[in-house]
């Protein structure tokens, strides 16, 4: 009933409502301006969205552990020894005697006496004798050598002090003489005597900020025939660490200072006295990944007068790790004024009779290369360098009855490429190769007389069960051009053929202190010529025993 009354009331109220009071439906609208919506300027997002996994924050606990002292009783007892098989300690040998005999009536004797391993001292005495008695070139190709050497060194916390002395004598002949000259046969013999002595001290220190040095005094008396040369030299390298600054690290500042006094006397000629002063400062450091060494090579030359001739060359070497611990590239600049001496001439060509002591000046040397290493078993190096050399020595044959050599000097530009490779398989096998390739360009000489354009060496060493030790060596040189005659307008030339020399040997240790050795040289038995008209000995072999004590 109440719902009916409520509905009737709504109907009655609705009858009195109107939508609008006006009955006129005509309306007018005045437009003031066009409507323009205001929008935010659009901007392109340049980065891609990154979806990151939410990282929950680590809970931060505020509880504390109350410390509590725990009483412990220390118990000291001996550590029991391990039950191992006890073996006798092996004392490595340092002394031995070696005797042998060869197919060219070649006696060999060697004696090496050295102290055992010691942390305070080392000393020793060595002697070697070798002689040939062949029938080659009417026995004039034979030789006799004696070599004795002694040394003493002491080691302490301050450094190493040592003394060395040696004497070597070599008797041989001008066996490349003309067969028709009977007078020459009476005067073919030559004897080289060389006495050397050295005293040195190398300081050591475990303090990085302490200055250290390596100082040595050297003397030698070198004589061949009537030519005598004496040399007195002292040199010292002083070096120390430099604190890092800016981006430079591992700095080492050093300087090598040297004094060299040389005298030369030949027959009745006036003695030639020369002084060489050297000063080579260096600064080695690391910048980022580069290792740099920079400095100067300085030589001041006095030729017996008061006039001093200075020669200064820059030195720079930079290395860069191309591949970490595998490959490194390097390059730089070098150059130096070098002393020519009787000793260096004869050690290069012992058949020289006219001694031209004109010094050599390497004006500049540019070099670049790469070193590579594969693990601990193989390494290699490849280098190319260019040198500009003043007074480059060249050996030419004289026209005397001995067929001896003399030296002429010329300006030279030399391009050299070197390749070297070494491989080792544990102690079982070791193989090495070295090759040099040259391109010469001389100012006045048409050929690089007696200089090869290619030379190579290969060596192999093997270890078979620590009892048999074979080894193999190969040496090769390309053809060479030779000149006979001092006149620049009237001389003859020849070609020295390319050659290779193969040598092999074996050491068989059939007892712990006794071994058998065999060494064979020039296995191909080719009497090639390193120096014009001086063929080497043919096939020669020596065998014998070595006793270790």
Task: Please give the residue ranges for each predicted region.
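Exposed, low-structure sequence patches enriched in small/polar residues
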Residues: 92, 97-100, 128, 291-295, ...
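Flexible loop and strand-edge segments within Gram-negative outer membrane beta-barrel domains
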Residues: 132-149, 164-212, 216-231
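Membrane-embedded beta-strands of outer-membrane beta-barrel proteins
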Residues: 111, 148-150, 197-201, 232-240, ...
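Surface-exposed extracellular loop regions of Gram-negative outer-membrane beta-barrel proteins
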Residues: 114-134, 249-262, 272-303, 426-437
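Short loop/turn motifs that connect adjacent beta-strands in outer-membrane beta-barrel proteins
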Residues: 85-92, 117-120, 155-160, 204-211, ...
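Outer-membrane beta-barrel transmembrane domain signature of Gram-negative proteins
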Residues: 189-200, 216-288
């Amino acid at each position: 009933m109440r719902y009916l009354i409520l509905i009737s009331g709504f109907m009655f109220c609705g009858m009195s409502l109107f939508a609008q009071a006006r009955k006129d439906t005509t309306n007018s609208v005045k437009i003031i301006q066009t409507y323009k919506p205001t929008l935010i300027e659009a901007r392109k997002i340049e980065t891609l969205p990154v979806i990151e996994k939410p990282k929950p924050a680590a809970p931060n606990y505020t509880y504390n552990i109350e410390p509590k002292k725990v009483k412990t009783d220390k118990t000291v007892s001996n550590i029991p020894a391990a039950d191992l098989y006890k073996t006798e300690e092996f004392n490595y040998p340092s002394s031995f005697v070696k005797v042998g005999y060869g197919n060219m009536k070649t006696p060999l004797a060697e004696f090496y006496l050295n102290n055992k391993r010691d942390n305070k001292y080392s000393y020793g005495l060595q002697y070697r004798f070798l002689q040939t008695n062949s029938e080659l070139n009417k026995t004039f190709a034979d030789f006799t050598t004696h070599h004795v050497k002694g040394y003493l060194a002491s080691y302490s916390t301050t450094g190493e002090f040592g003394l060395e002395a040696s004497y070597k004598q070599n008797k041989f002949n001008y066996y490349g003489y003309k067969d028709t000259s009977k007078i020459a046969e009476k005067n073919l013999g030559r004897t080289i005597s060389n006495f050397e002595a050295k005293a040195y001290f190398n300081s050591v220190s475990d303090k990085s900020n302490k200055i250290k040095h390596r100082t040595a005094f050297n003397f030698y008396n070198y004589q061949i025939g009537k030519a005598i040369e004496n040399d007195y030299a002292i040199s010292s390298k002083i070096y120390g660490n430099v604190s890092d600054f800016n981006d430079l690290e591992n700095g080492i500042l050093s300087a090598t200072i040297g004094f060299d006094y040389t005298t030369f006397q030949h027959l009745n000629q006036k003695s030639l006295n020369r002084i060489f002063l050297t000063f080579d400062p260096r600064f080695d450091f690391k910048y980022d990944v580069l290792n740099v060494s920079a400095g100067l090579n300085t030589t001041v030359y006095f030729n017996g007068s008061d006039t001093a001739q200075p020669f200064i060359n820059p030195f720079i070497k930079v290395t860069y790790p191309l591949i970490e611990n595998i490959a490194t590239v390097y390059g730089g600049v070098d150059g130096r004024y070098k002393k020519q001496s009787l000793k260096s001439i004869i050690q290069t060509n012992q058949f020289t009779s006219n001694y031209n002591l004109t010094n050599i000046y390497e004006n500049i040397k540019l070099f670049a290369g790469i070193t590579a290493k594969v693990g601990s078993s193989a390494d290699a190096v490849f280098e190319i360098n260019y040198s500009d050399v003043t007074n480059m020595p060249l050996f030419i044959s004289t026209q005397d009855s001995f067929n001896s050599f003399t030296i002429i000097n010329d300006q030279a530009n030399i391009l050299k490429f070197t390749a070297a490779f070494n491989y080792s398989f544990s102690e079982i096998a070791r193989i090495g190769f070295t090759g040099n390739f040259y391109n010469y360009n001389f100012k006045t000489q048409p050929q690089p007389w007696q200089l090869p354009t290619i030379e190579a060496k290969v060596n192999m060493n093997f270890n078979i069960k620590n009892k048999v030790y074979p080894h193999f060596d190969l040496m090769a040189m390309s053809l060479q051009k030779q000149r006979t005659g001092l006149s620049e307008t009237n001389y003859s030339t020849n070609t020295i053929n390319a050659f290779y020399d193969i040598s092999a040997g074996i050491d068989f240790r059939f007892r712990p202190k006794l071994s058998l050795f065999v060494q064979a040289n020039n296995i191909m038995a080719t009497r090639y010529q390193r120096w014009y008209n001086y063929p080497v000995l043919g096939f020669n072999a020596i065998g014998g025993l070595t006793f270790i004590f």
